[in-house]
Every structure is written in C-alpha cells, then in structure tokens.
Amino acid sequence: LIEQCLNTGYEDWSQLLPCDRALAVPSEAINPKHPYTKSIANSIGWQWRIPLQHRTGNGIVYCSKFSDDQAAADILINNLPSSALSDPKNLRFNTGKRKKIWNKNCLSVGLASGFMEPLESTSIHLIQSTIMRFFSLFPHKNDFRVEMNYFNNSIDEEFSSIRDFLILHYKLTTRDDSEL
C-alpha cells in the first residue's frame, strides 16, 4: 500500500550494508543450552546459532556479490553443531528503508518500513520504537503534517544510527579473509 498506492520510495543501503542473502536451517538440540545467540564471523559473512528448547536455530548471512548460495550452504552445513533437521531455506533481502515511514494515512511497521540485516535483531527494536513513537504523536485533528514530519525525521535518525552501528561491525574488524 505505501509503495504501490502512495509511491513513497525506498532508500537503498546496499552499498553500506552489502549482505543481501541468508540461509536458515534448524539442527538437533545441543547441550548444554547457552542462554544467548552466538554470532560467528566467517570469510563470506557471519553465522548465527540460537539454542532453543527442542532444536538449534542456525543461519548464515552473506553478500551475493562475493558468494553463491551453494558455497554459503556448504559453509553453513559444515559448521552446524549437530545434524540438520531440514534443507536450508534461502532468504533474500534488500537493505534500506522507506523514504517516509508515515506517509499520509499509512504507517509502515516492521519489514514494510525497511530492513538492515539480522546481526543485532534491530527489527524487533524498530517495530516497538515505531509503534510507541506513533502513539505518542497520534493525530487528534485532520491536519497532522507537523506530527508526521516530526515522526519521520526522528525515525529516520533512529534508522540511520542503527545502520551506522551495524556498519561498525564490518569496518572495525581486523579480519582480512573477506571482501566485506
């Protein structure tokens, strides 16, 4: 709705956050179960490992310019902590955000507003922040341009800050085994 009807536009951040693919695969549960997600850097991107009650969630995030799906799947499967429970599921995404999260009478929330990458689970925070910010500015009159402009400016700052935080993960590393 916000794109097809309102032509809001999308800011492409793929030059800043080049990872645009992920593969996800569950594996058998591991013990001991650690109460945290493990992020593991590798030569094509990074992997996640999330111990759950009855299985382990695993995935790899990478840039399609530097690796193909099969190479990523091989790295992922070879680094699983236990046997895979299914074939990897391929996920594709475009990093960036809507030019306006609130446009006229339409509010973009979650993946409709944008996506950076799953490294820090920032989408969960941005959903909550978007909803809370919108409710705090909820319009009580027909002309809500001031509230809408304030909302869009402040949420733009938040998206940009999170984007820059994610970029630091790649820019401050001393790794030299990857083009990322």
List each model region and its residues.
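A conserved FAD-binding loop/helix module that cradles the flavin
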Residues: 115-135
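Flavin-binding catalytic cores
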Residues: 54-55, 63-90, 139-149, 153-159
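Hydrophobic/aromatic beta-strand patches that form the interior of the parallel beta-sheet core
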Residues: 23, 89, 107-109
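Single, function-defining residue in the core of a domain
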Residues: 74, 98-103
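Short, solvent-exposed loop/turn elements at beta->coil junctions and helix N-caps
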Residues: 92-96
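Predominantly flavin-linked oxidoreductase catalytic cores and closely associated redox partners
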Residues: 1-83, 131
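Active-site-proximal substrate-binding core of FAD-dependent oxidoreductases
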Residues: 133-180
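Short FAD-binding loop at a beta-strand-to-alpha-helix junction that anchors the flavin cofactor
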Residues: 49-50, 101-119
